[in-house]
Amino acid sequence: MDFRMTEEQELLLDGLRELMERECSEDYIKQCDAEGRPPVEFYKALVDNGYGLLGCPESVGGTPVDNLTLMLVKEEICRLGGPIHALTSMFHVDMMKEFGTEEQ
């Protein structure tokens, strides 16, 4: 299996790095932690920039990507100091696709 990143993956991660730099500074995360609140502005920025439904089918407004791409995004968010719970929904995309229905 070839694990080299595609051009699309590199562009996706470049965009994510720029987003993290703008919306998820270390000071911002510390402030959220001190206030005992989740970083909702960062979550909103992820959604507004197309990362919220990454891995979901286009039919539900998502951007279909493979598991390797999802893992690269998760890894980059963590590497850059982002909140791990920002990734929670990404872990369940495969289960939703496999076991979910249109009605749900």
PLM regions with names:
Residues 27-49:
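Short secondary-structure junction/hinge motifs that connect adjacent elements
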Residues 18-30:
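N-terminal capping segment at the start of a domain
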Residues 8-19:
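A non-catalytic, amphipathic alpha-helix used as a structural packing/dimerization or gating element
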Residues 6, 31-33, 63, 98:
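A generic secondary-structure micro-motif detector
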Residues 1-8:
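Intrinsic disorder at enzyme termini
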Residues 48-104:
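Internal helix-loop-helix
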